[in-house]
Amino acid sequence: MCQAARSGVFVSPDQYPAQEPFTAIGAKYHDEVLRRGRDVHGIEIAYGADPYQAITIVPSDNPNGDVFIALHGGGWTNGYKEWMLFMAPALNAQGIPFVSAGYRLAPLHVFPAGYHDVLDGVAAVHGKIAQYGGKPNRTFIGGHSAGGHLAALAALRDDWMKPRNLPADVIRGALPISGSYNVGEGSGFSMRPRFLGAPDSGAEQAASPINHIRSDAPPFFVAWGEKDFPHLCKQSEEFVAALRAAGIEAESIVLPGCNHATASYETADPHGHWVPAASRWMREH
């Protein structure tokens, strides 16, 4: 595993391999989150040979030990770890070292490639975060949209820690935002997500977090926008109910007035609904 570190790095999207063309909504989101995070700098650590296989750590000046790993959205076909850097200042102010983790994208890399990248990114954080004020046993994972899906899947599946020499409780808790928890039948998607690969791959079952709920899973703090995509609101409600039915502690928050994009922006507002609640939740767990 490659783990070369570079300090004070902001990698431009122009330095990455080409992605699928953005939708109009995606292009607007891309421009906005890069604008919001343009002054945030951190330490970049590669965990693989592909440019997308890297994490950026933004330390807190007064770390309390909690660590938050953020995974970007983009429909599994778009996005950069730099998208999430705008979240760092508000969480840093709460004493939380912030990590944004990149992963390879579809359609070139279909499931489970990007998911496995996320797991390797968690392993890199576990091995490095103590140098930056974080406690490896206080690692929380979250993300927006597709990133929320990947965070939930990593928290629920328990077949990946041992091969990476990680403790079974390496994930302290999960905080997905506007995520997808069912990518198969009944998901509400207008078309089959491209990251699943060929229709006969059977990936829907393996890739759906709701299929991996286990009674000893870590706790969840699930958020979504009041005006989010209807199928994601429904999925979020059903996911929280399923977690609770399995005996897993699950807190939820509906972000007032937020649509899919502004739910993401809300996670960087120190005086908004998400940052104070999520920071408190991490401290308590």
Predicted features and spans:
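N-terminal cap/lid segment of alpha/beta-hydrolase-fold proteins
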Residues: 4-62
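Primarily recognizes the serine-hydrolase "nucleophile elbow" in alpha/beta-hydrolase
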Residues: 120-188, 204
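Mobile cap/lid helix-loop segments that gate and shape the active-site cleft of serine hydrolases
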Residues: 34, 179-212, 218
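Short beta-strand/loop motif that positions the catalytic acidic residue
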Residues: 216, 222-224
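C-terminal catalytic histidine-bearing segment of alpha/beta-hydrolase fold enzymes
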Residues: 223, 237-240, 244-285
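Conserved alpha/beta-hydrolase "acid-adjacent" motif
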Residues: 229-238
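Short beta-strand element of the alpha/beta-hydrolase
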Residues: 65-75
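Short amphipathic alpha-helix adjacent to the substrate-entry channel of hydrolases
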Residues: 80-100
